[in-house]
């Protein structure tokens, strides 16, 4: 089945995911395009309401339960595979691949990956993600892998929101490296193109789409200062110190987007980037991104303006974290 098959449902994993929200945005955009959406969710809770309002078909399943994926993939022509920065991605990919083969293995699968996905990545998650992609390929699935080698704007409130609000500081181990950035919505737009218009990409199973903007964390702090009307500064710290801070955040907010695997992954990547500088796969080209998706990408400044209340809200709440650096 191909993108020209407009009758079969498109399976969206991660449809209620929090960080980046690519699955939810993709579901909405597919429904706007008149496509049938089947959303895979782990449980029926309040997060499915927006999906139901869109007219999406809700299927309960878990990437760690192969049997639950069989009915989810039945009759599917296109599928979007995404997985949070967390443990278990290889098993999840194996379950997905086995279920896809059981129902015929005809679905074309778009994989939302990341620039750290590589067999020799310094990050354990990066190596695991690469292996998961290999597993999907070994199953004979028709893959288009999107290695987004950009940080999500959403990383800033997720990883640094409380320190920004409570202390006016961003702390991490990326140093003064200038990095490419993209919004979760624009990453989802790339996924939309991959599902419906794969011909817009160059030949090849693995793609490295461009980012929207090139910024150091000091520049990120400067934009925040201007938009939030208060001084925000960037403080470089060691990998170990940032990992400890992220682990404390994960402990204080169980079930949140930050978890021990994410803490290890982003602190490891931060240290590697600070040491090596800009990675070869990193490009920021807003014009090229617009040509690919058909819409102007969101800038970080526009993201902050859009999410201003998110940056300010918890300043009114008592802090559950204490700084480990002063």
Question: Model-found features: residue ranges?
Answer:
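Residues lining the SAM
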Residues: 13, 82, 294
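A general structural signal for well-ordered alpha-helical segments in protein cores
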Residues: 93, 129, 157-161, 217, ...
């Amino acid at each position: 089945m191909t993108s020209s098959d407009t009758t079969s449902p498109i399976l969206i994993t991660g449809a209620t995911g929090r960080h980046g929200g690519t699955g939810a945005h993709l579901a909405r955009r597919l429904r706007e395009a008149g496509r049938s959406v089947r959303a895979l969710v782990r449980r029926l809770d309040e997060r499915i309401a927006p999906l139901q309002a869109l007219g999406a078909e809700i299927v309960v399943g878990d990437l760690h339960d192969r049997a639950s994926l069989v009915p989810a993939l039945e009759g599917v022509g296109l599928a979007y595979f995404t997985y949070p920065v967390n443990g278990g991605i290889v098993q999840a990919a194996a379950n997905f691949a086995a279920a896809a083969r059981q129902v015929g293995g005809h679905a074309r699968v778009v994989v939302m990956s990341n620039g750290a996905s590589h067999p020799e990545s310094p990050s354990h998650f990066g190596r695991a993600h690469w292996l998961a992609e290999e597993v999907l390929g070994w199953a004979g699935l028709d893959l288009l892998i999107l290695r987004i080698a950009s940080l999500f704007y959403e990383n800033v409130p997720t990883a640094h929101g409380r320190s920004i609000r409570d202390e006016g500081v961003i702390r991490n181990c990326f140093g003064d490296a200038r990095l490419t950035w993209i919004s979760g919505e624009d990453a989802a737009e790339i996924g939309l193109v991959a599902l419906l218009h794969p011909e817009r990409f160059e030949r090849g199973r693995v793609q490295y789409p461009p980012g929207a903007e090139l910024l150091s964390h000091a520049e990120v702090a400067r934009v925040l200062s201007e938009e939030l009307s208060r001084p925000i500064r960037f403080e470089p710290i060691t990998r170990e110190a940032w990992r400890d801070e992220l682990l404390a955040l994960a402990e204080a907010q169980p079930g949140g987007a930050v978890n021990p695997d994410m803490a290890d992954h982003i602190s490891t990547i931060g240290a590697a980037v600070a040491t090596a500088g800009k990675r070869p796969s990193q490009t920021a080209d807003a014009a090229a991104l617009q040509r690919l998706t058909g819409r102007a990408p969101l800038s970080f400044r526009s993201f902050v303006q859009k999410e201003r209340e998110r940056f300010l809200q918890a300043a009114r709440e008592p802090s559950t974290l204490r700084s480990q650096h002063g």
